[in-house]
């Protein structure tokens, strides 16, 4: 994928102009020496990572490398800028409108990306590593601001009406979920999906795609949520590839996507899509990502307006009977849910039992390390006393990250083996290793091998 490095830099807005006037502009008189350790760190990063870019379908991305770069002495001004922005965003108001959030965050990203060109180690990064730094900054700030920008979480925290745009997210989420529940019983043929494979095989692909899409609520950053959309779309494309329907484009893709959404019953999809569109940098949504995101939006719009007339129905009497059976089942499920709620012990952190708690453990761990940069600097003697404890913490973090990544690798391998049951498991594992367990590139490679 080719990066578009011609970024339009807006100069009229500088969110920290007052800070610079008060403290002196740290951008002035910045000198860079050939033996600067910060520059050396950047050059080492470029060398170590360059091999990973060759032959890779996706731009290089490593959030931990970005955090390490941000912890170098030369990046101190960037840390101060980021700390100031986050503190002001969180402290000045409990509720920003969606439009205000978009402008504030977009303006800050433009500002801080411009500052990357002034400070080491970022100043010496090549294009792909600079993109990684920008991706990392987006992930960092949105991880910190998630509960204020993601409508369901914001509403759960404030427990009061929000601005019109945030409330519209919640209303559309409810509308979508209601439609999904009412029409979850429909068959593929009602969506004009050709009957070209056994239902068991179709359901397997649909389950896998729904599972990948369902992971969207586990993550906080727009990029990670977008990856969930991309992975689900790759699974659907795999289904179309096996049934020789991929040449039909959106005419085949969107109906299958609709079917996956109806069967998966993933919550907060409207809010998630809007969150991606609002806070993912436009330069990062290109090509297939833009296509798949637009397709998901089209599928959601179709479902929210879904009626019996939207479907291809051969026997309306049978359809009505199935609809009524499902309606009765929904009533029974609701009654069971009410009984369970009465038996549950209230959770102070989850007043209504619906607050999303993203499970992006690796990101949360690394962000917690970044929080240390925001803490006041202690006396030298105190720092020395904490060295041993800090070293142990870093070892624990590294160990936990490796454990989480290994579990994800195993889960991806199992998913791929279910998708391609006729393929040699050792070959699937080799592809999984080569593609770093990213299900999108893995599916692409395995589809090519299965031709």
UniProtKB/Swiss-Prot annotation:
UniProt modified residues of type Phosphoserine: 375
A Pfam family assignment: CUE
Gene Ontology molecular function: guanyl-nucleotide exchange factor activity; small GTPase binding; ubiquitin binding
Motif GBH motif I per record, residues: 229-237
UniProt xrefs under InterPro entries: CUE, DUF5601, UBA-like_sf, VPS9, Vps9-like, Vps9_CUE, VPS9_dom_sf
PROSITE patterns in the record: CUE (PS51140), VPS9 (PS51205)
A single GO BP: Golgi to endosome transport
Motif (GBH motif III): 287-295
Cysteine-cysteine disulfides: none
Localization (cell): Cytoplasm
Function: Required for vacuolar protein sorting; may be required for the consumption of transport vesicles containing vacuolar protein precursors. May bind a Rab GTPase such as VPS21.
Domain writeup: The CUE domain (Coupling of ubiquitin conjugation to ER degradation) is monoubiquitin-binding and is required for intramolecular ubiquitination.
Protein's name in the database: Vacuolar protein sorting-associated protein 9
